[in-house]
Amino acid sequence: MAKNQSGKFDILQLLSPIILIGYLCLGFVPNLQAVDKIAPQWVGMTLINLVSLIIFISQRKLIKQTISKVTTPYLSLFYLGFIFWAGLSYFYAINSTEALVNITRQVNVLFMFLSMAVLLCNLNNKARFISWTLSIILSIEIYAVLVDAIEMINTNGIIVPNSMKGVTANRNITAFSIAIKIPFVLYLIELLKKKSFKVLLTTIVFLALLSLSMIQSRASFIGVGLIVVGYSILQTVIYIKQSRSKKTLLSLGYILLPLFLAIAVNQIVIAGKGADAVSRAATISLSTNDGSINQRLRYYTDVLTHISSNPIFGTGLGNWKLKSIDYDSKDIKGYVVPYHAHSDFIQLGAELGIIGFLLYLGIFLWAVYYVFIYIRHSKSSIEEKTFVFLLLVALGVYSIDANLNFPIARPQVLVVWAAIIALILIYYQNHKQADKPIKTKPFLTPVFLSLAFVCLVPSLYITNKVYKSLKGQMFLLQDFNSNKFNLPLNQVDTVVPDIPNITVTTIPINSVKARYYVNAKQYDKALALLDKGTKANPYLFYSEILKSQIFQEQGKLDSAKVYARKAFFGLPNNDLHSSRYLNLINLTRDRKALEEAFTLLTDKNKLNNWKNYLIIASGLYPPKDKNLVERAKRATELFPSNEEIKALYRQIAVGQVGVNAAASFSAKGLDYFNVQDYTNAAIEFEKALETNPLDYAHFENAATANYLIGNLEKALEQINVVIEELNPLNGKCEYIKALIFIRMGDPVGACPLLFTSRDSGYSQATATFDQYCR
């Protein structure tokens, strides 16, 4: 049994490995009926933190020095300062409830880091233990990815990288959860001498890289590049400063051989099944032609704009997802919001100001500094320095993730980050302690334990409420997304607790509840909930669209239009917002409002918006309004193959009276045509085209009739209007012109026209083409 220096039973030595394994395995906690598995994972983290706290309280006399050791370095002080500053954001946050949820999470991560540091201080062979634990976890994650790939191939014959989730919620989390563990496997390869272990561990590296090649997260490819460069630098330095042995340089094979083999297998076996890693890697660039990169750059610009305007106090921790809607409002489709800025660092700057950004960045900078000091000045063994350097490489992988994604919101990757930071801190403090004993500050122990207790107990309450909410949101969001009302009305108020007050997609929960009361026509109850919903998220305007619906159902069209206008101008790219506002403009015959909405309505050139605008405008503007005609013409240029747009253009440019009159002339012309009176048919068809010069059918009919009576020049003039100006792309007009050319004695000139007509799908052209052009 483990004993301390006094010969007494040491419970920390016994329990430290168990608790550390518990932390590191948090990523395996499943959804447990929640919308997102992070909810039960945060609960799990809180519970393990509380278990650690109970042990620390029971062993408080033995850990006095350790607590001083882990809480007094600048890294820890910066981290504590960051949490304190984040806590203050509760008082100025857009949504203080959401700030509270996120403050609770960050307090848990802080205590997890400090707890890990205390546990690692009391753990022998910590480097081996952590590396073996993470290697085993990595093997399980790889297995899950390979199972996904095999199932996809067996089911569909291809691999769908976007669906390669493994044991996590999405492929980016899976990819970085795998990549960040590779340095620990490389350390074991360096450490162990048995060839069988080296082969086993090298195989794990190969399978990890092969998994990443199938997942195809480009950011993880950059992470792999950092690992390769870092490991190469390590082996080169060891070669220069230590052995000068070729064997040292050959150690590069432990990363290069698996890498080349993974690429080869990917290209030979997997690329043809939808997961070509080389082609995917080739798309890594800063080009704005890439949709994903363009989106991230837009998010970064919004964040930096906000920081420049709010350098001290931001939106409040966890509140950028709300303010981002305001910045990105013209590009948001539906209610899919930019939930994260895809860079933890600058997002924290937007949420907590420059001070919060610098405090968080300081944690990383101090970690890098500690590694440099340890490697440069420590008298530790090459084995320990190798491990610490590889910790820095792993931290670099996390930093790439943190600059391109949002690992700060995901416990699965955060636990590894906390372990890395804790290990760096412990090794640095051990180095300092070797030169000069670290002074124990007895007062820190009761302060630390008391603050931990005061923070963690409420944290359990809040994280559990969030978990219960995410279970209830499963039902609310299923109904919301399918526009159904399966949840009974008597369960609506109790299906989720009051924390948080927005869904995982930022829709106010009270507003989602209100839709059930709107459906039940309990309007007063619904309006009260919607007022609360607006306060929870004032930028999404879902509450306003429901208020508009309520007032319209009550016959209060002006009030309905006021709220529909707010919703439309708030999120103009939302089809529900635009269609409701246009409908109310039409009902109230408000031409001024339609004119005001035009620019935003057509900004993205969406077919339905243009069509709805033209339909409503045609009833509000006078016939042949010049401005409206120009807009209708522009619509035909944007959507040249859409018959509804063409019909609306004709109706607007000619007027309904003109369209009807032309149709009447055309009908008379067809009557003459059917009895072979082509002269009178031509007269009626020409009346039709003069009345409605935008309908190509009138020109085609007139040209055909004139062709049949031998009026070839006029027929050619009329059919040229169709080809050159109206361009219906139906093949018929080219066929008619070809017949005119043949009758004029120019069959050679007719052949290109017949070729075009045949290829456009006009079947009558085939026989004529074969007769004259073969």
Where are these regions (language model features)?
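Alpha-helical transmembrane segments of multi-pass inner-membrane proteins
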Residues: A2-P30, M45-F56, I83-Y90, N102-V118, ...
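Transmembrane signal-anchor hairpin modules in multi-pass inner-membrane enzymes, especially those
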Residues: M1-L88, S96-V101, F111-S135, L188-L200, ...
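TM-adjacent membrane-interface loops and short helices in multi-pass inner/ER membrane proteins
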Residues: D290, Q295-P338, F345, L352-L359
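Flexible juxtamembrane loops connecting transmembrane helices in multi-pass membrane enzymes
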Residues: S163-M164, I227-V228, K247, I263-T301, ...
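Canonical tetratricopeptide repeat
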Residues: V512, L546, R580, L614-I615, ...
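Register position in tetratricopeptide repeats
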Residues: N519, E553, L587, G655, ...
